[in-house]
């Protein structure tokens, strides 16, 4: 079964985004956002080609988690690597 692996940049972006949401909107928003991310990751384990192909040569896929947030990932050797999580605004 595939595993989810976060690179350092994506992990920091996720943490920074959680911190921003906490400061601006409160704990409930952070909980909702975090839940949405991990629900998506569970779905991604079952359907790794769920996102749209953003970079064909590097086989990088993207998925809009929320109108303001996109996650970029790549499947490689049975693992799914989270490459970036960023604000679309």
Enumerate the language-model features and the residues they cover.
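Extended, folded domain segments that form the structural surfaces/walls around functional sites
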Residues: 33, 41
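Arg/Lys-rich, positively charged N-terminal/basic patches that mediate binding to nucleic acids
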Residues: 1-32
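A general structural signal for well-ordered secondary-structure junctions
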Residues: 27, 47-50
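Short proline/glycine- and basic residue-enriched helix-capping loop/turn segments at helix->loop/beta transitions
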Residues: 42-46
């Amino acid at each position: 079964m595939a595993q989810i692996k976060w690179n350092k940049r994506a992990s920091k972006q996720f943490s920074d985004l959680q911190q921003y949401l906490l400061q601006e909107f409160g704990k409930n928003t952070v909980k909702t956002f975090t839940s949405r991310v991990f629900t998506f990751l569970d779905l991604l384990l079952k359907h790794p080609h769920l996102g749209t192909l953003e970079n064909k040569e590097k086989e990088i896929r993207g998925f809009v988690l929320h109108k303001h947030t996109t996650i970029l990932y790549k499947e490689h050797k049975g693992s799914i690597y989270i490459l970036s999580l960023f604000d679309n605004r």
